[in-house]
Amino acid sequence: MSYSRIKSYAKINLALNITGKTSKLHKIESVVGFVTLHDVILIKKIQSKKHIISFKGKFSKNIGPKNTISKLFKFLEKEKLLTSSKFEIKVNKYIPPKSGLGGGSMNAANILKYLIKKKFINPNKRQLISICKSIGSDVALGLNSTFTILKSNNQIKEFKNCKKFNVLIVKPSFGCSTKEIYSGVKKFTKPRFNKPSKKMFSFDNLKKLNNSLEAISLSKFPKLKNIKHFLEKSSNKSFVRMTGSGSAIVAYFKSKKLCDDVKKKFSRKYKNCWCKVAKTI
C-alpha cells in the first residue's frame, strides 16, 4: 500500500479573548484562520502489531513518544473505535513548536480527518467531540482548515471565501509554555463573538481586535515586545498580533510586495529569528 500525503496547515489566532474559567480550563473565544505554512504527513496502513510514528525536519528535535498523534491512536483504541488497523506515519515538521501555531494539534486533527474519510473509524458527533477534547483544545478547529469563529461556549462557526491576507510569521529562538502564559491571566472580557458574521474577517475589523494573552507574553519576554514594535514600525499598512500564547508574532498585509519588503528588513535586524512569508487559505 502506498502512502497518502496530507498537508497539515498552521493555525493562527487573528484575535483571542479570555471570557472566563471553568474548574480546569480557561474559556476563550477566537477569530481563527489557517495559513499556507504546513507540515507534511505521509500515512499508510501496515501489517504490524503497533503503529510506527516518526518525525523529521528542523522542528522535530524535541518531539517524544508521547505526542498528539500517539495520544490520538491511544484514545481511539481505548474507546474501541479503532480495533485492528495499524498505521505507519511520517511527519515532516515545518511548523515551529511552542509558537501558538498549533502544529501538533493540527497533525492529530488531519490524521483524525483522514481516518474518518477512509472509513477506518466512524465516530458519532459526541464521540468526535470527546476525541478532540482528549488531545487538545485546538484539535476541533483543525477538522476543517478554514476561517472560523470559536465562540465562548465552544461552538464553532465556519466561513468560506473570506478575503485572504499575506502574512509574515516570526518566531524567536525560544517558545512560550501555554500553561505558563495562561497562569498569568488575571481578568476576563465579556464575550464579543457570540454573533459571528463574515464581516468580522475584514482587515479593518480585525485591526481593531486583540489577543488577551499578548500582554502577558510580552511582559514575560521583552524580546517579543521589541519584535512586535519593529514590525509595527516597518509598515503602517499592516497590523501585528501574537497568535495563541506565542511565541510567534504575525504581521498581516494586503500587499504581498509590502510583506516581502518587511521580511527583508526583519531578517537583516533579527538574524537569529525564524521568519516565513505565507498566505491565509
Q: Locations of the language-model features?
A:
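ATP-binding N-lobe of GHMP and related small-molecule kinases
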Residues: M1-S99, I116-Q127, K171
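Short beta-strand scaffold segments in enzyme catalytic cores
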Residues: L16, D39-I43, A140-G142, T148, ...
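Hydrophobic C-terminal alpha-helix "anchor/cap" residues
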Residues: V32-V35, L76, C132, L231, ...
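Solvent-exposed alpha-helices and their adjacent loops that cap or buttress functional pockets
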Residues: F34, S134, L141-G142, F159-K163, ...
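Conserved, helical-rich catalytic subdomain that frames metal- and/or nucleotide-binding sites
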Residues: H51-I53, N144, T148-F239, Y252-K257, ...
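Conserved phosphate/ATP/ADP-binding segment of small-molecule kinases
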Residues: F59, K66, S70, I129, ...
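Glycine/serine-rich anion-binding loops at beta->alpha junctions
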Residues: N92-K117, S137, F239-F253
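Contiguous, small/hydrophobic- and glycine-enriched helical/loop subdomains that border
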Residues: L112-S152
